[in-house]
A protein has these predicted regions:
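Hydrophobic alpha-helical membrane-interfacial segments at the cytosolic entry of transmembrane helices
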Residues: 99-108, 282-284, 302, 315-341
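Alpha-helical transmembrane segments at the extracellular/periplasmic loop-to-helix junctions
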Residues: 4-14, 256-257, 357-396
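Membrane-interface transmembrane helices that cradle and orient dolichyl/undecaprenyl
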Residues: 260-278
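Membrane-embedded, hydrophobic transmembrane alpha-helices
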Residues: 1-99
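Hydrophobic transmembrane alpha-helices of multi-pass, membrane-embedded glycosylation machinery
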Residues: 286, 298-312
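Active-site lumenal/periplasmic loops and adjacent helix-entry segments of GT-C-fold
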Residues: 108-258
């Protein structure tokens, strides 16, 4: 497969399964497509862990079986939760032409990132000889060879002699493995194309979702659509995601950051749309299963939103709103328990990989305000984008 066509197929594998689940959950097409990748990751997460424990191989057919099972479950839950649907609120969704405007901005941002990938990836069917890139490609190969895709069974790959238990988030790789089976691509090719697809789509769409969530309550539909489209296009200009994240081969981390914002927005919408709770649980499971850091980004956003907004503007009363959020959090924690236990068993190993920066608290705050990290030391600070961001924050 070629880079452009292969990326298109990878986008379909990433977006389509979750979009089907979202439509079953009665989400509109724009919302379903935006949250689709997070739900896809959630479906994969709920498949690979029990499959690994039961010895069921992960492949295209078992992935399809997991999707069908989740679709049936979501259908049943929607029938049970139908009485909680807020049809009046649903009627306030985005109109057709404003949605087209937003889609144009998302597509422009995606094309700009794709063009950068086309110009920058000269040997895209192979991977660089860095530990992370080689590990990710090997993990895809391991899944294709053995059918074992569970995050809690990665010790079978990492610890060849002892097979000592090891937790490593493998949802991203499981999606890439299905892509390889569908297209016949090599593991290195599938890994690269899946990474490009995540980079191309998740950040423009995530920027659009967050901007719409912030602007629409305080602005008219067309103005919100224009600002949202602009933000989606500008998302291709930030250095850290996806470019530097892609360059250091932090692909699960990249994908988790990309689906964190749509998941956050979906969870906030459950206060008014309680029938979306199952979809929110599935999306949050997906984010945590791709990489734990993405899940903690969601939690930080939720805490900020609750303390700065929802606490003072409850939808159904503070206790009722807390109960709704708890209905999302508790099932998520129960589903993720095996993965959390796996991480806790590796606490000493994780501590051994600490990277002290030796920066003062003051310098840390300055770096945060300037959107700077150690990986960006070789790049200039994007003062123009920073100023625009803070100007928008001041206006809001």
């Amino acid at each position: 497969v070629g880079l452009w066509f292969g990326t298109l197929i990878a986008l379909f594998v990433l977006i389509a399964p979750g979009t089907i689940v979202a439509r079953i959950s009665q989400l509109s097409w724009p919302v379903a497509i935006a949250i689709g990748p997070a739900l896809t990751y959630g479906v994969v997460a709920l498949g690979i862990i029990p499959y690994g424990a039961l010895g069921i191989p992960w492949n295209g057919w078992t992935a399809l079986a997991a999707l069908v099972a989740l679709c049936l479950l979501m259908t049943a839950l929607q029938l049970l939760l139908a009485r909680y649907r807020d049809r009046e609120a649903e009627s306030l969704g985005i109109g057709r032409w404003p949605a087209v405007t937003v889609a144009a901005g998302v597509l422009l941002g995606s094309l700009l990132i794709m063009w950068a990938a086309y110009r920058g990836l000269t040997h895209w069917q192979s991977v660089p000889s860095t530990w992370d890139a080689v590990w990710h490609a090997n993990e895809v190969r391991f899944m294709l060879d053995t059918g074992q895709a569970s995050s809690t069974h990665m010790g079978e790959l990492r610890n060849v002699e002892t097979h000592q238990a090891l937790y490593y988030p493998s949802v991203f790789h499981a999606v890439a493995a299905v892509f390889c089976q569908l297209t016949g691509a090599a593991p290195t090719t599938g890994y690269t194309l899946s990474s490009v697809a995540a980079s191309v789509w998740l950040f423009p769409s995530g920027a659009a979702v967050l901007t719409w969530r912030l602007i629409r309550p305080v602005s008219g539909e067309w103005r919100a659509a224009g600002v949202t489209a602009t933000a989606a296009a500008l998302s291709a200009s930030f250095t850290s995601v996806p470019y530097v994240e892609f360059g250091v081969a932090a692909m699960p981390n990249l994908a988790a950051y990309g689906v964190a914002i749509p998941t956050f927005v979906l969870i906030t919408s459950t206060l008014r749309h309680r029938d979306r709770i199952p979809a929110a649980v599935l999306a949050l499971v997906g984010v945590f299963s791709v990489h734990l850091t993405g899940g903690f980004v969601v939690i930080l956003f939720l805490l900020a939103w609750w303390l700065l907004d929802a606490l003072f503007h409850p939808v159904r009363g503070r206790l009722a709103d807390v109960a709704t959020l708890g209905a999302v959090a508790v099932p998520t924690m129960l589903v993720l328990a095996p993965q959390f236990l796996g991480v806790l068993r590796q606490a000493d190993i994780i501590a051994g990989h600490a990277f002290p920066s030796f920066k003062s608290a003051k310098q840390g705050v300055i770096d945060a305000l300037l959107l700077h990290t150690r990986h960006l030391n070789d790049f200039p600070i994007q003062y123009g984008l920073v100023v625009l961001s803070y100007a928008g924050m001041a206006i809001l």
